[in-house]
Amino acid sequence: MKILIAISSKKYSSQTLEVGMRVAKAFNAKPTIVDVGDKINQFSLKEVGVAQERMESWDLDRPGVEVLEWAFDFLSENKFIEKKEIESGFPKNTLIETGGRRSEVYLKGTVCDDVSLILRNGEIIEELISEVQKEHYDVTIIGKSQSSKKDYELSQYIDSSIFIVNNYQLDRNYKILLAIHESHF
């Protein structure tokens, strides 16, 4: 089973990441954590490439990397990745471009074989739908949108089961009703 966990920041996504990793552990699933950053204008792609090269030489991070670094720290603190990965620190220099708007870093997990951290740029709904279609995730875990209906919109168009985290409290026990169809679960 493959699970996509969509995050946006420490402030708004800590509950989503916590629940997502607990679900991945419970189902022995392969978790992928994704952050969707702002869309890069097509006219400025060349300038962005030059800026990224300069940022690397100046040891500055590209936008969105700090969210992935926070997710790495969370995975480290909760021992979801191997000790060797933790000791090496966040591998921002091994962020691999896997498409025009998609970069990925692979980590060796303790819950399952691999944990992936992905940074995408663009409109959040479009990018998450594209990610699910391309990688064939079984479940997408997102946080409840506070100010918009993006969670509702995503639930209408995404081609996977969806789990929306809303006001999760660590000290409570929850029951989850899993509605399934005739898929390979």
Q: What annotation goes with each model-predicted range?
A:
Residues 11, 17-19, 117-175:
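Gly/Ser-rich helix-loop-strand patches that form or flank binding pockets
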Residues 73-140:
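Structural beta-alpha unit
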Residues 40-41, 91-92, 148:
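Short secondary-structure capping/turn micro-motifs that flank functional sites
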